[in-house]
């Protein structure tokens, strides 16, 4: 049976022109009304027309075809003769069917006609086969030639010209019975519409045939190469015969056999005059395409033409039912159910889009324009014959060991191509061999010793294989990988591919070299993040051998599966105590982003990339002081053993997913874990899983669990109480008072001593109380009072807190107690026994004892009843502070309780009080001053109020809420917008709260109680309202170029409760200032000014009235000065003016480019004399901005070791700081080294002991600075179940430092980004422990979850401004709207401002004094697809990759992108409104991933819809920033597909520049960076935002001022006492 061919799309049947009689014409029309199916109608028409073809013409056509096959007639001559015959007897009257196409010949995605494929068994080509594969029937060359000729079709890629008679061969196929019945049932109903449709199609074809007659002459090309679309402009005489011939051929073929299927590679549009005529020619000496023996006889079923636009969808559906046959076994997925047409709307029903056909062997799409066919070399022979050629022999007959056949022969192989059994060129590295798909190759074999890759001296071979395995044998000592194939007969080292196969093989070489880059990069950078890996890939110059200009992120994502597999293979050879490098942060991101399948079988590749293990560069072993070392090796050892035991018990359960191939493998029986198993003769004690069966999926999951803490903190109670259980009453029978009563007060008789069971107890002693629950430890308390009343013999207990009840948990010293603010009255009978609690204060020489052997806290305390305490512990905020120095008065010693006094002071402080009364009018008492929380408020003061305290007469313009998203219209251009199921956009300020309302106090009054006393609980304030710019009728646009502290006076008044007042601020009339507005704004916190008044009735701005000025201005000009009338300004400055504060000598460890130092300098508290930074570019940037600082670029461990050894200078002669020199120590030690492990076992503990955190704590212990600050990522407080936090605080407490921790949001301190940072503050004994700074700006609530959960207890910082703040949020517009427009990749060092920005915030005032050019923009360069994607991201807020259109785009280098194919049903997202599929991989259907489904060079990255369902649809990737929003956390390399996500400029098609990132961090434009673009990005991304550092510095400054004031007061008091004594 001849092979079936692909019919052209069947047009309305054309009859021969004038040669047919009228009755025949009528009969042709009647056939269309006889109720026949479409196929039957076509068959009858063909039979009718065949009667009018003259016999001699048929004979002549057959003779011409025979001559063409025998090459006695050229193709040009054949076409000319056929044209003559056809023009003589046949004339086509309908023309060619016109079909629209895209530039590459592929219909738009979703608009493809219905495809169905039916696969039939085909005979294989003759060849010698290895025995395991089994014999196959061979065909003669004549049979093959007949099949090739009978199945030839006009195509772009075949090498033979289509013949005419071949279209009339073969019987017509009958339609299945069920289809025929359905067709008959619907035929009569659609009869009239079919007739109208045929007439319209015929007219269209006629017009198209007249307009599209341009076919180029056949062009001679290399066999097997892809032919591009032909150009217009050849001679008309040469084009017309060929076009007419092809039209007739397609029509005759359609009439003869409409069911014939397309051959692979056949383009299925009839109107392809500009493409199909280009055929591959060959020299006459070259044999015909022998690969056709392997090509399928049937691969694609008949294609139904798509009606012209405007046709009824019902017609298309009916046509498809008539002409489409059902395939017995679909190649891909079941077709989705059709969408029913709504009768009320009268619209067409949505037609589901079916899959394009695929090759059943290699899985490639048959309509892919890049699909190529194999062309064998000239005179090629099969493999056995080739191997016997003498040219391949390296031995002669005299060789004594010639006849040994222990191993397969090895040869070099060049000019090779690899193809499947159907002749499609295909890669070998996509898993086809692993799936037992037979792949063959052809080319030129050479002897193993040959080095010349040319074809000279080689033996041409064809159909070698099938390939049993392919392998990589490392590299050739340079950049080229050695790759080979193994067959049943020999092994072949590959040299150079054929020109046709070079693009495919180039990708294979590219992925191998990228794997080499990744493995070598991870060897030295195991803690690198994804952006660092992309930086490495993009900055590596590709070797010339692989013909790639540059590596990109798309290159890495394209080969991600292969790269991860190679990294896994590298990890297979690791030592047991080594951490797998595939668990590094960058590899986990790559695995998630690209959807890599872990644990796949890799046995088919004999060897992997052999990269020599390189000793990882990094910090040396941690240099620790003895105190720090003792903490880790003594107090934590028991916890380590406990965790190790838990690990061993749970390893077997945690190491299996049961799905991947690694888990399903049997135990190897050879590794250390297997040898310990009982079944392999071991003891079975270790209970470890086989090292070869450790599931990679679970390993990645466990590593991800600690990657980032969740934003949503569970609702847990704050540990404000000890939650002591019920106490157990003791049987104390003998309780008696000793001595006389001390005092009698309120029915209480106080005593000083008591005897309990012959044990004397007096006030001030400590006792233990047994809990009712025996599993709990003893409760300990200090007896502060003893008395007797009606309740019996009582005592007042001031409780101690055990270390395990603090944030320290199990890391605390078991003998250490902490004072807390809790006390209780109890009966003496509850006392268990007397204990001893010693206060251990700091030694007089504490600061100089650093680094020495630590003394025992309680030498000889082994009786179980002796404890010690150093600090007061605040359970609300986890603050360890020195105990208060309050001394009891002489008359209060018998009942003096520190807890009661502190609580009373706190209540007294929080209670509102009236200080000065003015008058009483109508039952109201008017006042001039009141106080609350230690702040005094007077008439004329300005105050903060919550946003709900009062409203404005102008209706507030609420933040613009985005309208509800309309249904996604996927008809014009398919997009993935449907994935945006949530309206939340990361980086949006839509939910940001309003800042405080501000008012000036006009009156203060309150009512009276019944007794005539002032009712201080009901104080009211009448005030004038201040408008902010956004509160006026100009709304938010008024803030674009206005200072953030600008207000407008208003005569509107409001009355508020004093309890609503949130604090005091300063508001001045700008014209009354004695300094510039900028100096005034920077002169202190909470400063505002106004220049105009706002009239809400007229919506106009006016001059402020006289009473708007501060009351103190009445004295202006009389020598009183400005300060007298404005006490709120002068009061905070008085202590600072009176006390000169020296700056702290600071050592900045891990300084980076100097963000912390810059903030502290702005706060005016420090002078950074030393800095340590190992990374040279950051160290150079620090030097540029701090020329007076000694910057060490050495390992911090080396420097500390030198100092501890008594060295004064380092190897470079730089002077080292000595003990006593450092007054403040600050830094942010990296902690990635132990961030990837889920449990704290002995291996991770060992790594933690050598981490930089331990080194930093040793610096603190040695130098003993006055203040200590540790900054780190927010997750620092959660690492290892908060164990890192606990150990850090434990070390500080053991050193004697007061300390606390908290999480701060940098966006609340004046930067346009969300950046949560963990801060640990510590103060030396005698200093005041700083509070955390109150927020200055409102910020998005989602980003302000700052609680920390430790051991199921929630801790918060001392911050009280939780719902609002003094200033509005800083936006992207504030940050960078004045910067000039720059292009992608611009690198000019200086660019002029677009316009000069005003002072937006006090922290950014440095912009005003800038030169005309800010330091370079330096945006990241993104070429090819990345830059093109940026240009297609819409400018609307919230846009990201899901808004990319699925279109073809020409890149700058001329390459045209492919459209992304959606060929699978997505079970989660369903189908589109048009019925189109939404899945890009078989995993969307719940199956395993198919590597053949991967797509490349698409505008929409294939990996994103592939893995989107598992990762929140990758929201934000390729995301555009919003002018009124903020940055995500600024990272070290802004990549559109990186962690930060939204990095595209709001209006320009590029990522944000270095200067824009620096501004988002709060760096002034005068701050200089060093190095290339990526170095600068890294410097900015790793820095602490200077505004945040400044806010912390100001809090430290307040502590210094308070200490200075106390010292001054003590000195004055001492002087007065001395004077009195004198």
Curated annotation (Swiss-Prot):
Zn(2+) 2 binds at residues 668, 671, 674, 690. Residues 146-213 are annotated as: Interaction with DNMT3B. Residues 759-884, 977-1105 form the BAH domain. Its main location: nucleus. The lineage of its organism: Eukaryota, Metazoa, Chordata, Craniata, Vertebrata. Sumoylated; sumoylation increases activity. Acetylation on multiple lysines, mainly by KAT2B/PCAF, regulates cell cycle G(2)/M transition. Deacetylation of Lys-1116 and Lys-1354 by SIRT1 increases methyltransferase activity. Residues 100-360, 702-733, 1099-1138 are annotated as: Disordered. Residues 703-714 have a biased composition (Acidic residues). GO terms for cellular component: female germ cell nucleus; germ cell nucleus; heterochromatin; nucleus; pericentric heterochromatin; protein-containing complex; replication fork. There is a cross-link at residue 1613 (Glycyl lysine isopeptide (Lys-Gly) (interchain with G-Cter in SUMO2)). A zinc finger (CXXC-type) spans 650-696. The N-terminal part is required for homodimerization and acts as a regulatory domain. The CXXC-type zinc finger specifically binds to unmethylated CpG dinucleotides, positioning the autoinhibitory linker between the DNA and the active site, thus providing a mechanism to ensure that only hemimethylated CpG dinucleotides undergo methylation. Residues 176-197, 207-222, 237-269, 276-300 have a biased composition (Basic and acidic residues). Keywords: Acetylation, Activator, Chromatin regulator, DNA-binding, Isopeptide bond, Metal-binding, Methylation, Methyltransferase, Nucleus, Phosphoprotein, Repeat, Repressor, S-adenosyl-L-methionine, Transcription, Transcription regulation, Transferase, Ubl conjugation, Zinc, Zinc-finger. It comes from Rattus norvegicus (Rat). This is DNA (cytosine-5)-methyltransferase 1.
């Amino acid at each position: 049976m001849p092979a079936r061919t692909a019919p052209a799309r069947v047009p309305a049947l054309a009859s021969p022109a004038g040669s047919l009689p009228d009755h025949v014409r009528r009969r042709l029309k009647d056939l269309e009304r006889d109720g026949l199916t479409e196929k039957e109608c076509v068959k009858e028409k063909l039979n009718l027309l065949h009667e009018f073809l003259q016999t001699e013409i048929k004979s002549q056509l057959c003779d011409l075809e025979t001559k063409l096959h025998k090459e006695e007639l050229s193709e040009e001559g054949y076409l000319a003769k056929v044209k003559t015959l056809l023009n003589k007897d046949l004339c086509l009257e309908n023309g060619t069917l016109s079909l629209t196409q895209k530039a590459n010949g592929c219909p738009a995605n979703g608009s493809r006609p219905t495809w169905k494929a039916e696969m039939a068994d085909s005979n294989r080509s003759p060849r010698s086969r290895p025995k395991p594969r089994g014999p196959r029937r061979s065909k003669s060359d004549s049979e093959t030639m007949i099949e090739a000729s009978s199945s030839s079709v006009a195509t772009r890629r075949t090498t033979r010209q289509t013949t005419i008679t071949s279209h009339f061969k073969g019987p017509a196929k009958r339609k299945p019975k069920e289809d025929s019945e359905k067709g008959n049932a619907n035929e009569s109903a659609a009869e009239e519409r079919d007739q109208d449709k045929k007439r319209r199609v015929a007219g269209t074809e006629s017009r198209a045939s007249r307009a599209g007659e341009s076919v180029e002459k056949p062009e001679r090309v290399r066999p097997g190469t892809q032919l591009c679309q032909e150009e217009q402009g050849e001679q008309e005489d040469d084009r017309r015969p060929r076009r007419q011939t092809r039209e007739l051929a397609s029509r005759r073929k359609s009439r003869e056999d409409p069911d014939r299927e397309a051959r692979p590679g056949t383009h299925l549009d009839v109107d392809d005059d500009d493409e199909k005529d280009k055929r591959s020619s060959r020299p006459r000496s070259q044999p015909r395409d022998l690969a056709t023996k392997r090509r399928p006889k049937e691969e694609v079923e008949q294609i139904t033409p798509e009606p012209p636009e405007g046709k009824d969808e019902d017609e298309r559906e009916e046509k498809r039912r008539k002409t489409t046959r059902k395939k017995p076994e679909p190649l891909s997925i079941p077709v989705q159910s059709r969408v029913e047409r709504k009768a009320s709307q009268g619209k067409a029903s949505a037609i589901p889009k079916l899959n394009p056909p695929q090759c059943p062997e290699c899985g490639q799409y048959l309509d892919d324009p890049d699909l190529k066919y194999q062309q064998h070399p000239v005179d090629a022979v099969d493999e056995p014959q080739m191997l016997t050629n003498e040219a391949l022999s390296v031995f002669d007959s005299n060789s004594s060991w010639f006849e040994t056949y222990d191993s397969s022969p090895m040869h070099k192989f060049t000019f090779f191509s690899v193809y499947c059994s159907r002749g499609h060129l295909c890669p070998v590295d996509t898993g086809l061999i692993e799936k037992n798909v037979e792949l063959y190759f052809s080319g030129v074999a050479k002897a193993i010793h040959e080095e010349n890759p040319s074809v000279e001296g080689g033996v041409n071979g064809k159909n070698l294989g099938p390939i049993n395995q392919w392998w990589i044998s490392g590299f050739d000592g340079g950049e080229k990988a050695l790759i080979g194939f193994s067959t049943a007969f020999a092994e072949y080292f590959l040299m150079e591919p054929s020109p046709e196969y070079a693009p495919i093989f180039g990708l294979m070489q590219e992925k191998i070299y990228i794997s080499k880059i990744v493995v070598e990069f991870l060897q030295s950078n195991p803690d690198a993040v994804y952006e660092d890996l992309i930086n490495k890939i993009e900055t590596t110059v590709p070797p010339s051998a692989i013909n790639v200009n540059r590596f990109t992120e798309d290159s890495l994502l394209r080969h991600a599966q292969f790269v991860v597999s190679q990294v896994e293979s590298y990890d297979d050879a690791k030592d047991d105590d080594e951490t797998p490098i595939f668990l590094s942060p960058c590899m986990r991101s790559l695995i998630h982003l690209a959807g890599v399948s872990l644990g796949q079988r890799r046995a088919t590749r004999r060897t992997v990339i052999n990269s020599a293990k390189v000793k990882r560069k990094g910090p040396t072993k941690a240099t620790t002081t003895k105190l720090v070392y003792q903490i880790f090796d003594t107090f934590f050892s028991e916890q380590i053993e406990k965790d190790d035991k838990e690990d061993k018990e749970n390893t077997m359960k945690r190491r299996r997913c049961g799905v991947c191939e690694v888990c399903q493998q049997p135990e190897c029986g050879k590794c250390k874990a297997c040898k310990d198993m009982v079944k392999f003769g071991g003891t079975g004690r270790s209970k470890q899983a086989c090292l070869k069966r450790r599931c990679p999926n679970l390993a990645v999951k466990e590593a991800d669990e600690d990657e980032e803490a969740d934003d949503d903190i569970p609702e847990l109670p704050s540990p404000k109480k000890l939650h002591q259980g019920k106490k157990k009453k003791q049987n104390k029978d003998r309780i008696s008072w000793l001595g006389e009563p001390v005092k009698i007060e309120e029915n209480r008789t106080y005593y000083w001593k008591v005897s309990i069971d012959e044990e004397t107890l007096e006030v001030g002693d400590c006792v233990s109380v047994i809990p009712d629950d025996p599993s709990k430890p003893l409760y300990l308390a200090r007896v502060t009072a003893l008395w007797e009343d009606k309740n019996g013999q009582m005592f007042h207990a001031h409780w101690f807190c055990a270390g395990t009840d603090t944030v320290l948990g199990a890391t605390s010293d078991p003998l250490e107690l902490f004072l807390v603010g809790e006390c209780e009255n109890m009966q003496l009978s509850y006392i268990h026994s007397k204990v001893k609690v010693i206060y251990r204060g700091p030694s007089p020489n504490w600061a100089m004892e650093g680094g020495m052997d630590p003394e025992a806290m309680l030498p000889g305390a082994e009786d179980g009843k002796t404890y010690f305490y150093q600090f007061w512990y605040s359970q609300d905020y986890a603050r360890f502070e020195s105990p208060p120095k309050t001394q009891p008065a002489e008359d209060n010693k018998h009942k003096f309780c520190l807890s009661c006094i502190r609580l009373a002071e706190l209540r007294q402080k929080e209670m509102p009080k009236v200080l000065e009364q003015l008058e009483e009018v109508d039952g109201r008492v008017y006042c001039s001053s009141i106080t609350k929380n230690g702040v005094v408020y007077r008439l004329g003061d300005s105050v903060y109020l919550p946003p709900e305290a009062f409203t404005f007469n102008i209706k507030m313009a609420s933040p613009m809420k985005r309208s509800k998203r309309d249904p996604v219209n996927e008809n014009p251009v398919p997009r993935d917008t449907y994935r945006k199921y949530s309206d939340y956009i990361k980086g949006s300020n839509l939910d940001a709260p309003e800042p405080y309302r501000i008012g000036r106090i006009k009156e203060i009054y309150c009512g009276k109680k019944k007794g005539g006393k002032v009712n201080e609980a009901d104080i009211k304030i009448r005030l004038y309202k201040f408008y902010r710019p956004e509160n006026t009728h100009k709304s938010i646009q008024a803030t674009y170029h206005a200072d953030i502290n600008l207000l407008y006076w208003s005569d509107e008044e409001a009355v508020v409760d004093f309890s609503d007042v949130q604090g005091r601020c300063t508001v001045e009339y700008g014209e009354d200032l004695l300094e510039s507005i900028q100096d005034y704004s920077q002169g202190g916190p909470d400063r505002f000014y106004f220049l105009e008044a706002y009239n809400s009735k007229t919506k106009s701005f006016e001059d402020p009235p006289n009473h708007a000025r501060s009351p103190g201005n009445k004295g202006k000009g009389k020598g009183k000065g400005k300060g007298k009338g404005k006490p709120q300004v002068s009061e905070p400055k008085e202590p600072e003016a009176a006390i000169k504060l020296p700056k702290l000598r600071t050592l900045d460890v891990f300084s980076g480019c100097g963000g912390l130092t810059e903030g502290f300098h702005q706060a005016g508290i420090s002078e950074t004399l030393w800095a340590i930074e190992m990374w040279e570019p950051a160290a150079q940037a620090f030097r540029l901005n701090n020329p007076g600082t000694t910057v060490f670029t050495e390992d911090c461990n080396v420097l500390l070791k030198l100092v501890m050894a008594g060295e004064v200078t380092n190897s470079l002669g730089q002077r080292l700081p000595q003990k006593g020199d450092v007054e403040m120590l600050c830094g942010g030690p990296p902690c990635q080294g132990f961030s990837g492990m889920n449990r704290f076992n002995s291996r991770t503990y060992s790594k933690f002991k050598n981490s930089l955190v331990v080194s930093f704590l040793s610096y603190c212990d040695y130098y003993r600075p006055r203040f200590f600050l540790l900054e780190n990522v927010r997750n620092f407080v959660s690492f290892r179940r908060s164990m890192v936090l606990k150990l850090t605080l434990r070390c500080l407490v053991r050193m004697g430092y007061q300390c606390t921790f908290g999480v701060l949001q940098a966006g609340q301190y004046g930067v346009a980004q969300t950046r949560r940072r963990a801060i640990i503050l510590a103060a030396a004994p005698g200093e005041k422990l700083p509070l955390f700074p109150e927020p200055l700006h409102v910020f998005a609530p989602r980003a302000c979850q700052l609680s920390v959960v430790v051991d199921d207890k929630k801790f918060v910082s001392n911050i009280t401004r939780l719902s609002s703040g003094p200033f509005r949020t800083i936006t992207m517009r504030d940050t960078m709207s004045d910067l000039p427009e720059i292009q992608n990749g611009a690198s000019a060092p200086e660019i002029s401002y677009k316009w000069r920005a005003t002072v937006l915030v006090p922290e950014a005032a440095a912009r005003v004094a800038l030169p005309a050019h800010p330091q370079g923009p330096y945006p990241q360069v993104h070429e090819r697809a990345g830059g093109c994607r940026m240009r297609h991201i819409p400018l609307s807020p919230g846009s990201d990759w899901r808004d990319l259109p699925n279109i073809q785009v020409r890149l700058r280098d001329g390459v045209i992108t492919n459209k992304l194919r959606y060929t699978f049903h997505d079970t989660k997202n369903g189908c589109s409104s048009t019925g189109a599929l939404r899945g890009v991989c078989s995993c969307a259907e719940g199956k395993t991933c198919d590597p053949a489904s991967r797509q490349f060079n698409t505008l929409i990255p294939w990996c994103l819809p592939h893995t989107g369902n598992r990762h929140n649809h990758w929201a934000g990737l390729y995301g555009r920033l919003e002018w009124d929003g903020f940055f995500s956390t600024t990272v070290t390399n802004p990549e559109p597909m990186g962690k930060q996500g939204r990095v595209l400029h709001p209006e320009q098609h590029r990522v944000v520049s270095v200067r824009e990132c620096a501004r988002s961090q709060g760096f002034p434009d005068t701050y200089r960076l060093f190095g290339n673009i990526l170095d600068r990005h890294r410097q900015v991304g790793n820095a602490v935002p200077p505004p945040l550092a400044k806010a912390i510095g100001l809090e430290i400054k307040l502590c210094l001022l308070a200490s200075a004031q106390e010292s001054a007061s003590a000195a004055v008091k001492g002087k007065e006492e001395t004077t009195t004594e004198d």
